[in-house]
Amino acid sequence: IIEGESVTGVTTMQMDEGLDTGDMILKTEIPIAEDETGESLHDKLAEAGAALCVKTLHAIENKTAVFEKQPESPTAYAKMLTKDLGNIDWAKSAVQIERLVRGLNSWPSAYTHRDGKVMKIWKALAKPQEECAEQTELGSEEHTAQKTGKNAMPGTVVSVAKDSFCIQTGDGVLRILEVQMPGKKRMDTGSFLRGYKVEEGMVFGRE
């Protein structure tokens, strides 16, 4: 998800001395949805993996299993997920950050800093610049992003609405839809904004 892949999958293989180098037996592909999260993909892979294990055992028992050598090309291994990986670099593009948010949901989660506190971001959408450049309204006050806009420093809030706010990235803006503050439950951004003040020009990412 983080790397923007559209397909993943599960493979059963024969054990040997190497790391994931044994002959392949069966495999199945799983398409990655546009709104896929690490948690939803984990559940899909777990279900597919269990079914594939049963199918593989039957094939071995019936002596119909076909063992296929892996390609000679270098193997790419996925890096371990760590909490530090979730620290959002707002200089990256909105698309990259959205993928990070989805890929690290539910563990270890993507996060940024606000007033010296960690704010986890559980749901966000990458949006074109112009979608957050329009005049928006929060309560009885009107806000406009004209004073910030696409020339704002990455991490800067460029617009605030009743149910979301947009943060400038290195390319595009990220609309924040679900967050969590320390000691609090996850909440949609509309609920968050009723208890926390977010204004245009505010900068996220500073510890």
Model-derived regions: residue spans:
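Donor/substrate-binding cores of folate-linked one-carbon enzymes
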Residues: 1-80
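Short amphipathic alpha-helical segments
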Residues: 28, 84-86, 172-174
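Short, flexible active-site loop motifs that bind/organize anionic cofactors or intermediates
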Residues: 31, 87, 182
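Short helix-capping and hinge/turn segments at secondary-structure transitions, especially at repeat
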Residues: 55-65, 86, 102-109
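Acyl-group handling in specialized metabolite and lipid biosynthesis
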Residues: 79-92
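An anion-binding loop in the catalytic cleft
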Residues: 90-207
